[in-house]
């Protein structure tokens, strides 16, 4: 347990990735922390995307609604995944970023790089998979 700023206790959630398939699209539900201080979280994410590429997955949605914290290492992992997908003419979309993540994407100008959607339905429609 970690004490919060206001004395409340909360747990530090390590990153977890749940994979599910919606038609031809793989959805990665990412939760917890995607930060450098959590050893291996960025590598775990990169490995997951590499496995999808090796398996021939064409379209990936990364649901970041439950990412509780992200830093430059986490952003770097997302950028690396995007680049890996784009190099092989595959597509990656982010859905449901928190207000803080939206702000980080904006100030780093990554909002111009990623296709960011509010909902899974919107992202699937963009892939033509509704």
Give residue ranges: language-model regions.
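Non-catalytic signal-transmission and effector/linker regions of two-component phosphorelay proteins
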Residues: 1-21, 128-130
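STAS-typified acidic loop motif
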Residues: 13-47
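General small-molecule cofactor/ligand-binding pocket signal
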Residues: 18-20, 95, 117
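Residues that form or immediately flank small-molecule/cofactor binding pockets and catalytic motifs
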Residues: 22-24, 99, 121
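Amphipathic alpha-helical interaction surfaces in cytosolic regulatory modules
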Residues: 34-114
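Short secondary-structure transition/capping segments
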Residues: 106-107, 125-130
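Short acidic-hydrophobic, aromatic-tinged amphipathic segments that line or gate anion-handling sites
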Residues: 115-119, 123
